[in-house]
Amino acid sequence: MNKLTFHNNKVMQDRRRVCIFLPNDKSVSIIINVKILCHQLLVQVCDLLRLKDSHLFGLSVIQNNEHVYMELSQKLYKYCPKEWKKEASKGIDQFGPPMIIHFRVQYYVENGKLISDRIARYYYYWHLRKQVLHSQCVLREEAYFLLAAFALQADLGNFKRKVHHGDYFEPEAYFPAWVVSKRGKDYILKHIPNMHRDQFALTASEAYLKYIKEAVRLDDVAIHYYRLYKDKREVEGSLTLGLTMRGIQIFQNLEEEKQLLYDFPWTNVGKLVFVGKKFEILPDGLPSARKLVYYTGCPTRSRHLLQLLSNSHRLYMNLQPVLRHLR
């Protein structure tokens, strides 16, 4: 009997390797069929993580420094690099460079109790941990110290004097770089242990809940940013769309910061329209002449943003009765 080489084996030629980056800085590598649906890949990832409730999570690829979330009904190759799709696999250990995919939070919620699955809550917490490291809320500096105390309780458990002293944690793993630079490591390592001690007897799950509740109060943590253009001729987007739990924000891009121009809660958004590259926001109760018109750069980005905004709005409206009950 002749042995088929991997190069000639059609089944193996359709196999590719993907590397899934997780919120907790770990990754998983999966061999998949190049024609797999995004939904099927998400199911495989969740099975590996033993995550039962994935409705707040999605798979994304980075394009032009933005996370593009996959439409789960689409085939994966719609999002993959051309070289990755074309390359024939050369053997079980020779699949070539993997496609990089991110498993991350796609839809934010303000209350961790809405996440009943223990594993899902864990990864939601870790996603926020990473977002906090990039946060720039300079007027809320005390919040970062409280968040670090919750995170240390979640990660290390109860404070133990004989174990938790000196450099028992890395400040850079818990604080934005500007806080570490401003206060210094010695200051943080001196004051945080007492705050860690104050969380005594909190379980990891309870610490996650407290962390989530405090983290989403920071304006730049539970938010997705996407570049927008003022007109068709702009090359560098001078505006940024911020998608939050509660609505849409429009920012002017300055040299080192974003200046908030508009803040539209979902209850004040009358209509969103995407036509080709054009993006229109019609605030509720205002005449059509008062609509805001921006540009996305290409129809594909328009479609992606429309789906993301529509799904976020739908989730927000559906969760309001549940949130009122939790309060």
From Swiss-Prot:
Subcellular location(s) of the protein: Cytoplasm; Cell membrane
FERM domain boundaries: 16-320
PROSITE patterns to which the protein is assigned, alphabetical: FERM_3
Matches recorded under PANTHER family: FERM DOMAIN (PROTEIN4.1-EZRIN-RADIXIN-MOESIN) FAMILY, FERM DOMAIN-CONTAINING PROTEIN 6
GO BP: any one term: regulation of actin filament-based process
GO cellular component, one term: cytoplasm
Record has Nucleotide-binding as a keyword: no
Membrane topology category: Peripheral membrane protein
Gene this protein is translated from: Frmd6
Entry keywords, A to Z: Cell membrane, Cytoplasm, Membrane
Stored InterPro entries: Band_41_domain (IPR019749), FERM/acyl-CoA-bd_prot_sf (IPR014352), FERM_2 (IPR035963), FERM_central (IPR019748), FERM_domain (IPR000299), FERM_N (IPR018979), FERM_PH-like_C (IPR018980), FRMD6-FERM_C (IPR041781)
SMART domains per the UniProt record, alphabetical: B41, FERM_C
Superkingdom of source: Eukaryota
Gene3D superfamilies reported in the protein's UniProt record: 1.20.80.10, Phosphatidylinositol 3-kinase Catalytic Subunit, Chain A, domain 1, Pleckstrin-homology domain (PH domain)/Phosphotyrosine-binding domain (PTB)
Protein name: FERM domain-containing protein 6
